[in-house]
Amino acid sequence: MRTDYCGLIDTRYLDQTVTVKGWVHRRRDHGGVIFIDLRDREGLVQVVIDPDTPEAFATADSARNEFVLSITGRVRRRPEGTTNAKMISGEIELLAKEIEILNAAATPPFQIDDENLSETVRLTNRVIDLRRPAMQKNLRLRYQVAMGVRRYLDAQGFIDIETPMLTRSTPEGARDYLVPSRVHPGEFFALPQSPQLFKQLLMVAGFDRYYQIVKCFRDEDLRADRQPEFTQIDLETSFLNEDDIMDITEGMARQVFHDAMDVELGDFPRMTYADAMHYYGSDKPDLRVSLKFAELTDVMKDVPFKVFNAAANLPNGRVVALRVPGGAKLSRKEIDEYTQFVGIYGAKGLAYIKVNDVSKLTTDETSGLQSPIVKNLTEGVLKSIVERTGAENGDIIFFGADKAKVVNEAIGALRIRIGHEHGEAGGYFVREWRPLWVVDFPMFEYDEDDDRWTACHHPFTSPKPGHEDLMATDPGACIARAYDMVLNGWEIGGGSIRIHRADVQEKVFGALKISPEEQQNKFGFLLDNLKFGAPPHGGLAFGLDRLVTLMAGADSIRDVIAFPKTQRAQCLLTNAPNAVDEKQLKELSLRLRQKADVAGGAA
């Protein structure tokens, strides 16, 4: 029987005989003595095998990396000068008496401690990849976070209730994963994008406080922080307002960070969506970077410089400045790189002014401002730029001028990049956790392609009191009772107070141009049950994968999921998705359309 994990054998076991079991991490032959580093989930222990135990020595001599061994031996102190303070077992070693090979191993596709691996190699050989200490650490952290959430919510009176995995297809903004029904030919279940409607119905049923750590599914284009199947920490409450829900979930975040990482989160300031977009160009601002936008749209409407003038006079245009303290020393090469970078977000260029002497705001060769655009601006405008940005000698000011969406995304991304690259040295970046709440989101946003209003969060979010009538007269001015928890530029949780009256829910559907017939067809079960005394209710969902990615400092969300999909929604380990045979399709009353034969295609 195993005495303890390899990584936990320490000086407590000195002079005792112990048995450990694990994988050969490394094997070394030094002058007739064999050393094996045996690994399990808790770490390594150094095993020494000398020729005085010939049977154990012969077995050790035949062992190779990743063989599975059971080793019994006596614990002794390592010789002076060979200890390793970074390991729990670093002061001791195990002098082997008996070694049993529990299983041999083929040569692994890579060394466990190899850190220079492509993601394709790692995901194809995911089982071996999961043996790496970094992956073990990430998944242990994920477990600790999940357990911390459960402990906290249990203590707060929440009940863990499962909701269906097979449900009906309802529009929630992304494509559904559909599951054909064998019993009902031609009809389909959908895998849930969230438990949203079921958790609201649980509130109508009187459960008061619900939570669930649950899988959700969205068939959408994938990015670094997205997966087709992902895990939510989902909760819903009755009879609480926004402040109550934010207080509860803020407490949960504090406890999880304390228990899992020994981190004390600071204050959670609240910022309106309007302020977040005005100052940071993002509804999930990274407050570690202190740089802010300065609004210049109003002063650029009549300037001779066409780039600024045209943008300032667009109905949805915007002109902003971003002051970078000490940025005048940026090289031409760096500025060119930033110009290319903002182009990714649709910006057509990146104007800038280097501030050499703020006392000389002229437009001629005597100017203390260095830039090709200075001559196209007036002294009054230059003064406004310096005053609004608070620019000082040695600074650089970057400008964004375009549709507001382009400006927000391009200059917002530039703000983050410059902050991370130069902020610590320049005093405008702090390396710590900076949480906040973003509140007062718009209820709707206009989709120009479809010529209609769409829900910013989802169509079950309640408007602020007094805003119900705006849904029919001015949807763009309607504010939602929605809130997002943001941490270091990542939205880690989002929620809202829900609509608990059927008549208000019908008004929202109407504003979204969902006909009464479609409302009843797709959401009749919700509307009908809201009429049976639904309590005021609201909730929030955290993305567990995203939260753990942030806490672990991982490069990708795939580094905190045991068996993730690629950005093409494939599992390289199992080669899923895969074709199925004709018999299975026939049972489901399905027939695949053949791909068009384009050999020698049309001219």
Swiss-Prot record:
Entry keywords, A to Z: Aminoacyl-tRNA synthetase, ATP-binding, Cytoplasm, Ligase, Nucleotide-binding, Protein biosynthesis
Reactions mediated catalytically: tRNA(Asx) + L-aspartate + ATP = L-aspartyl-tRNA(Asx) + AMP + diphosphate
GO cellular component, one term: cytoplasm
Signal sequence, start to end: none
Site entry: Important for tRNA non-discrimination: 30, 81
Subcellular location(s) per record: Cytoplasm
EC number: 6.1.1.23
A Pfam family this chain is assigned to: tRNA-synt_2
Biological-process GO terms, alphabetical: aspartyl-tRNA aminoacylation
Stored SUPFAM superfamilies: Class II aaRS and biotin synthetases, GAD domain-like, Nucleic acid-binding proteins
Sequence positions that bind L-aspartate: 172, 218, 457, 498
Highest taxon, organism lineage: Bacteria
Keyword ATP-binding tagged: yes
Example GO molecular function: ATP binding
Sequence positions that bind ATP: 218-220, 227, 491, 543-546
HAMAP family the record matches: Asp_tRNA_synth_type1
Function statement: Aspartyl-tRNA synthetase with relaxed tRNA specificity since it is able to aspartylate not only its cognate tRNA(Asp) but also tRNA(Asn). Reaction proceeds in two steps: L-aspartate is first activated by ATP to form Asp-AMP and then transferred to the acceptor end of tRNA(Asp/Asn).
Subunit structure: Homodimer.
Family: Belongs to the class-II aminoacyl-tRNA synthetase family. Type 1 subfamily.
The protein's name in its UniProt record: Aspartate--tRNA(Asp/Asn) ligase
Biological classification of the source: Bacteria, Pseudomonadati, Pseudomonadota, Betaproteobacteria, Neisseriales
Gene encoding the protein: aspS
